[in-house]
Amino acid sequence: MPTIQQLVKSARQKLVNKTKAPALKSCPQRRGICLRVYTVTPKKPNSALRKVARVRLSSGFEVTAYIPGIGHNLQEHAVVLVRGGRVKDLPGVRYHIVRGTLDTAGVKGRVQGRSKYGVKKVSAKSAGKSK
């Protein structure tokens, strides 16, 4: 424990919070270009083929971003919007691609949690016509 004299000479240092998404440079989202779209396997004990993309952001960073939802239309050179948010069972994946913006289509047939997957509301009229 420091003495009062030591505290007078130099005050206590404030702890600096480290950002969890440094590539976004304090912005909520960033635009980027897909360099490679591929699948990776998660850590134990999970098993799957998770869809991810290597993205070069407008901030100059190159990051790995997760593609949420079932099915996607992303290819190399697609322009995407990237937000923060890690995927717990994929080491090194600290970003998510936003569905339903720029070149990324929304998830087809999604009815619940639509806002997270870029899907417009299906009205009762149009739902009746499709059957």
Curated annotation (Swiss-Prot):
One of its GO terms (biological process) is translation. Keywords: Chloroplast, Plastid, Ribonucleoprotein, Ribosomal protein, RNA-binding, rRNA-binding. InterPro entries: NA-bd_OB-fold (IPR012340), Ribosomal_uS12 (IPR006032), Ribosomal_uS12_bac (IPR005679). It comes from the Eukaryota. GO terms for cellular component: chloroplast; small ribosomal subunit. Gene3D superfamilies: Nucleic acid-binding proteins. GO terms for molecular function: rRNA binding; structural constituent of ribosome. Its main location: plastid. Pfam families: Ribosom_S12_S23. It is found in: Plastid, Chloroplast. The keyword NAD does not apply. With S4 and S5 plays an important role in translational accuracy. Located at the interface of the 30S and 50S subunits. HAMAP family: Ribosomal_uS12_B (MF_00403_B). NCBIfam families: rpsL_bact (TIGR00981). Part of the 30S ribosomal subunit. Belongs to the universal ribosomal protein uS12 family. This is Small ribosomal subunit protein uS12c. It comes from Stigeoclonium helveticum (Green alga). The gene is rps12.
